[in-house]
Design a protein with these regions (language model features):
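A SIS-like phosphosugar-recognition module
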Residues: 1-146
Length: 146
């Protein structure tokens, strides 16, 4: 709820992720926020963050960082550890923060992208409310030939 209230009207929002979180990062920015909510975004991999993007981040820039539990976790942790030095408008969503009752620790890395997908879906419910824009409405998709 808080995330949606804070970000529903962002002029631009940056999503950062790596490893098995890259799918959630990319698709959430492009398919959900751009296509379905009509909000401007950019998705970037954690390993590319320090090759340009961090130069455009300011104190107010909206940035969401996804952290998974696979071998690429250190890349996203590096971004998460750095971002507070330059930005006050960031969110870190770490799959480790969500309990997976009955799932062994050694398997979490294989499931963490599903956790992120569930988190994104919960955010979407609140984004629809805040934007007053049902996500099934499109301007062009399946409305015009292209």
């Amino acid at each position: 709820v808080e995330f949606a209230k804070k970000h529903w009207n962002d002029e631009m929002h940056y999503f950062v992720g790596a490893g098995n979180q890259w799918g959630a990062t990319y698709s959430y920015a492009m398919c959900y926020w751009e296509e379905q909510l009509w909000l401007k975004t950019k998705s970037i991999t954690s390993n590319e963050f320090f090759h340009g993007m961090f130069e455009i981040v300011t104190k107010e820039t909206p940035v969401t960082i996804y952290i998974g539990e696979d071998a690429q976790r250190p890349l996203s942790e590096r971004v998460a550890n750095f971002i507070p030095r330059i930005c006050e408008n960031y969110t870190i969503i770490d799959s480790k923060d969500y309990e997976l009752k009955g799932i062994s620790e050694k398997y979490r890395k294989h499931l963490s992208h599903h956790v992120m997908h569930a988190v994104n879906n919960r955010i979407d419910v609140h984004m629809e409310i805040e934007t007053r824009h049902p996500m099934e409405i499109r301007r062009y998709y399946r409305r015009l030939e292209y």
